[in-house]
Amino acid sequence: MKVTEDNIDVIKEHFSKVFHYVGLELEDEISEIAEDDEEICVDLGSIETNIDIAEFLQKTENIESMSYDDYCVRCGRFTQFNIAIEGHFYGLDASYFYEQFNKQGISVSIREEPLLIGLRNIKEDMYDMDYWSPIEEYVALEISYEKEQYKLSAEDEVKLVQRVLFSLNSRYSKTFTLLQLPDHNPMDVYDEEEVESDSEQTDVDIISIESLPHFSPMLQMYINAKEVKDYSLRYLMFYKILEYISPFVAQKLVYEKLNQKLDKLLVSERNSEYLDSLINLTRAYDNSMKDGVLAKLVLDECADLVELQDLIPQPVGGIKKTPEN
């Protein structure tokens, strides 16, 4: 969008209104907006930030509705969740991540320099005029709604974001987690690392939101485990996930075997051998519920341990499969 003779006064008035709302006095910058401009340069001390005019007008159309909690900022048809990508809090080039998650009227994507989060940080004075930008240091998962009627509740937005984070964690070798918005001037120093692309893809990868796993306690446990920085503790939390699903896996297996036994009843007599097999099946199920067997049961049933054997820690090395199995 370019500034024209017809819209320049409206654009200047809107910028002035929004900046006043968040506590900025930038009349000089506003007065310098000229025809054919597509961006405005905002000077925050030693930090200059270029703001796309079209995006600014779209996302701050209802600036009075802006609200925020510990992790996200909402304004009109947009919600931005602050996220971290493991090892790359600073200098991240989010263009390496191509996903756009869509369903009717709703789109979720990664956004560098998230405008709404930046405005929240300015309003709350959570930036440093000399060293820390309120916008450029952040990355967000942005939910955009085509119309107000498609807006989710705050609770459902969190569930949707957790589903998207699960998908991103599964796809990349980076850990994507929600990150609490700053409650002070965040002058911590992070290591700057180069982000390597996991593919040579350059087009946006459109993914249906309907294809994502449904939100569940197990999905929440997975996200919580990925947020733990200590790898030993993270491993223990992943083990708890195996424990969580193991009763369901054990029940599934015993149902399958029980059905096989009952099918056999149709073609054979109910003799002592048959009844003993049912008793043994029950005993095997009881044994499968013991702590020492649970992890083996889940991994044997749900994972290809031939491919994973080099990644399995030594304490569970005894449960590895061989090709013959």
Question: Which residues does each predicted region cover?
Answer:
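Charged, non-catalytic interaction/linker regions at domain boundaries
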Residues: K2-D230
